[in-house]
Amino acid sequence: MINKGKSWRLATVAAALMMAGSAWATEYSASFKNADIEEFINTVGKNLSKTIIIEPSVRGKINVRSYDLLNEEQYYQFFLSVLDVYGFAVVPMDNGVLKVVRSKDAKTSAIPVVDETNPGIGDEMVTRVVPVRNVSVRELAPLLRQLNDNAGGGNVVHYDPSNVLLITGRAAVVNRLVEVVRRVDKAGDQEVDIIKLRYASAGEMVRLVTNLNKDGNTQGGNTSLLLAPKVVADERTNSVVVSGEPKARARIIQMVRQLDRDLQSQGNTRVFYLKYGKAKDMVEVLKGVSTSIEADKKGGGTTAGGGNASIGGGKLAISADETTNALVITAQPDVMAELEQVVAKLDIRRAQVLVEAIIVEIADGDGLNLGVQWANTNGGGTQFTDTNLPIGSVAIAAKDYNENGTTTGLADLAKGFNGMAAGFYHGNWAALVTALSTSTKSDILSTPSIVTMDNKEASFNVGQEVPVQSGSQSSTTSDQVFNTIERKTVGTKLTVTPQINEGDSVLLNIEQEVSSVAQKQATGTADLGPTFDTRTIKNAVLVKSGETVVLGGLMDEQTQEKVSKVPLLGDIPVLGYLFRSTNNTTSKRNLMVFIRPTILRDAHVYSGISSNKYTMFRAEQLDAAAQESYLTSPKRQVLPEYGQDVAQSPEVQKQIELMKARQQATADGAQPFVQGNK
């Protein structure tokens, strides 16, 4: 048996669907009489192609009819309005699904947060964050709750620290409340009071009043920090400018009047013990600062000599005590505060820079000297002096040996000759063949390093002083000659001035020099003293901390061939080698200089680098000690581990322990430590 009431409702729904189908595709008409709310929701979802989830608590009958054709947006708003009338709301989800819940549950659901660009319309459930500039939200929120449906889906919450309102409800209601807030939130701090100070400093007064006002707000005051009165100092006229609400301005003005009183003393004196800076150098900086302060206070003027100035009716004096590295300053309180800030910013630990240089030099040289010399007893012959064994000298030394039996001449010739020499004679002819091949290799690696302060020049010098004859003078009374000797330093020199820039970059002004005494004298300078090999680089580079860059280098290759020969005879193929001397020399030299700066900003980094260097040096000592024989070498002294105290005698160790005990007793606030007699 079919229920007649239910059949009538189904017929009504069918008629409504037929009416909707007969309209345009984007227009709808609705007519529901005593229809179940679930059927109404399902019909709307089908027409709008929306998936709708219905909460189980959504139940009831509805009666509604639309006489006009509605477009899709109007139809959706009509749907929301009907649900609002019956105490329900729609919550859109991220995936496009709609959820129908009771209105009082909607405000705790994931409803969208809107703003001025898209505030929402109609009966959509939205949340709006409204900033308030001139009125306390604590006082405004209760008024708005009376205009909102707090029993349903509406809600008004205030947040004091940011002075904002969080309004939740139907979009039309929320927009109306936002408009109410805008009209109520009128600027109430346009009035300004200017207080001319007679004795106190405007800057110091503003700092004091601001701190007091801030403390009052943080202790639970009703006024938000955004609504607190604003206090600004006008240093030019030594005035305080106050703006805000009338009551707040009156309280600030009264406070300023009470503080702006004449002090009994015209100044005070303080002693600043510096931790890092040098008091004597800082005095000059503070004198310049005091000059600027006086110009600001008086509108121009000059300071008295010696760092004294008359500022604000009082004397300003700045001096340094070098024995304690302290500054003694006498000034008015406001000036003292400014100078104290300057001292605090100047007396800081300056960064240091570790500069490590690597100097690499590789040199190779090869030489070949071949020569044949002839002599005749009747006179004549060929002789080449570049062999360091001329045949004429050999003949004279041989004749001296044959006639007198002395070998002095031959010994002197042998001292200056290297290589092989072979000779023979037949009849009146004699021949001398000399041959010499040389090969030299040299690898030099130097790694000087130095630590210096930022913007402080430092130098490093390791080498020896070589005596060089600079002149000579004959005596007027005798035949003696007096030579003047100077000392020239040779070795490794490093002079550097680092400047730390922004972003851990270091500008290095570097002067690098590596010098040594040449093993081979330049031709024709044997009587003039030693010859020096010098490599110098003077440069300025910008390097990032920890990076290694090349400063400069040299790649040099020289090939030299010297031929001494008898004209015509020395040019004969093959046989010409018997009438000439050939000297071939080839040399190569590669020189590179690298640099690496490292910024040391704190003691931990400095200690870590020192520990690494110390440990590496100690490891070399241990390795050398392990390779030495206990029978041939005495026991090598090795450095203790890094951070470990050097062994002391028992008496010294006892005194150190007593000193540590006294320091510990003083730090713990105990009774003074007294050593008793035993």
Swiss-Prot record:
The record marks 463 as: May serve as a pivot that allows opening of the central gate for substrate egress. Residues 26-122 are annotated as: N0. GO terms for cellular component: cell outer membrane; type II protein secretion system complex. The keyword Oxidoreductase does not apply. Residues 189-264 are annotated as: N2. Keywords: Cell outer membrane, Membrane, Protein transport, Signal, Transmembrane, Transmembrane beta strand, Transport. Residues 1-25 form the signal peptide. One of its GO terms (biological process) is protein secretion by the type II secretion system. Residues 352-602 are annotated as: Secretin. InterPro entries: Bact_Secretion_Sys_Channel, GspD-like_N0, GspD/PilQ, NolW-like, NolW-like_sf, T2SS/T3SS_dom, T2SS_GspD, T2SS_GspD_CS. Residues 267-347 are annotated as: N3. Residues 124-188 are annotated as: N1. It is found in: Cell outer membrane. Coiled coil: none annotated. Residues 604-678 are annotated as: S domain. Forms a cylindrical channel with 15 subunits. Involved in a type II secretion system (T2SS, formerly general secretion pathway, GSP) for the export of proteins. This subunit forms the outer membrane channel. The N0, N1, N2 and N3 domains are periplasmic, while the secretin and S domains form a channel that is partially inserted in the outer membrane. The N1, N2 and N3 domains each form a periplasmic ring. The secretin domain forms a double beta-barrel structure; the outer barrel has a diameter of about 110 Angstroms while the inner barrel forms the central gate with a small pore in the closed state. Belongs to the bacterial secretin family. GSP D subfamily. NCBIfam families: type_II_gspD (TIGR02517). PANTHER family: PROBABLE GENERAL SECRETION PATHWAY PROTEIN D, SECRETIN GSPD-RELATED. This is Secretin ExeD. It comes from Aeromonas salmonicida. The gene is exeD.
